[in-house]
């Protein structure tokens, strides 16, 4: 699923985020990606999806090199960023337009998840609250049913009941064939649903273990 060896990346020559990072991750698990601000969590997610390009080393995801950004690869991965600039359109139109890029997109599931989150498809994404927008985007991400789903701080901006809904839908509406990586500072929000954790510190993996081992 994911193979990383000797990965190097820096935003400038003097600011290296990763120096020789190595990582192996198999298929079909929910992993919590942990670490303080500035440790490289978001950078790693973007490298895995081809939004940033490694400077050296090996990186293989789903049998593809993300650096090549092949359509067949991009259709199988999705990164839900912490912050998303949304257009002034309805949730339904956003789902329709963006879901068309993913062959695995399940429109019926998307609408079912909106109901669970108490959202109407006709709501304008620009005019709803931050928490509502976050839930709409989570519903879209899960409805894509991609083999590799990455989420950057998905519970930020959610109230306690919404966090419970998030845990429930993640457990209920993901399959054993999917691999999900969730970057978070709030591990207590996810400890009941994640299978393993990976902890980054100063651009290095200091812990990779199952939840039972931690």
Place the predicted regions along the sequence by residue:
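A short, flexible loop at the N-terminus of ABC-type nucleotide-binding domains that lies
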Residues: 1-20, 27
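Catalytic Walker B motif of ABC-type/P-loop ATPase nucleotide-binding domains
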Residues: 149-153
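Conserved ABC transporter NBD signature motif
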Residues: 57-68, 72-73
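The feature captures the beta-strand-to-loop junction immediately N-terminal to the Walker
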Residues: 34-36
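ABC-family P-loop ATPase nucleotide-binding domains
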Residues: 79-136
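Helix-to-loop junction immediately C-terminal to a conserved catalytic motif
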Residues: 49
């Amino acid at each position: 699923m994911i193979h990383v060896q000797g990965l190097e990346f820096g935003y400038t020559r003097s600011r290296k985020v990763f120096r020789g990072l190595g990582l192996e991750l198999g298929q079909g698990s929910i992993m919590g990606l942990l670490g303080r601000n500035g440790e490289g969590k978001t950078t790693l997610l973007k490298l895995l999806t081809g939004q940033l390009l490694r400077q050296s080393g090996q990186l293989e995801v789903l049998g593809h090199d993300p650096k090549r950004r092949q359509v067949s690869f991009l259709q199988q991965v999705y990164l839900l960023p912490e912050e998303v600039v949304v257009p002034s359109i309805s949730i339904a139109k956003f789902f329709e337009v963006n879901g068309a890029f993913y062959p695995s997109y399940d429109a019926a599931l998307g609408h079912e998840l909106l109901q669970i989150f108490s959202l109407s498809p006709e709501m304008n994404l620009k005019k709803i609250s931050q928490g509502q927008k976050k839930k709409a985007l989570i519903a879209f991400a899960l409805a894509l049913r991609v083999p590799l789903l990455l989420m950057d701080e998905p519970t930020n901006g959610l109230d306690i009941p919404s966090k419970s809904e998030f845990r429930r839908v993640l457990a209920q509406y993901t399959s054993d064939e999917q691999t999900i990586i969730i970057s978070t500072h709030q591990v207590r929000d996810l400890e009941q649903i994640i299978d393993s954790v990976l902890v980054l510190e100063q651009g290095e993996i200091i812990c990779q273990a199952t939840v039972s081992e931690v």
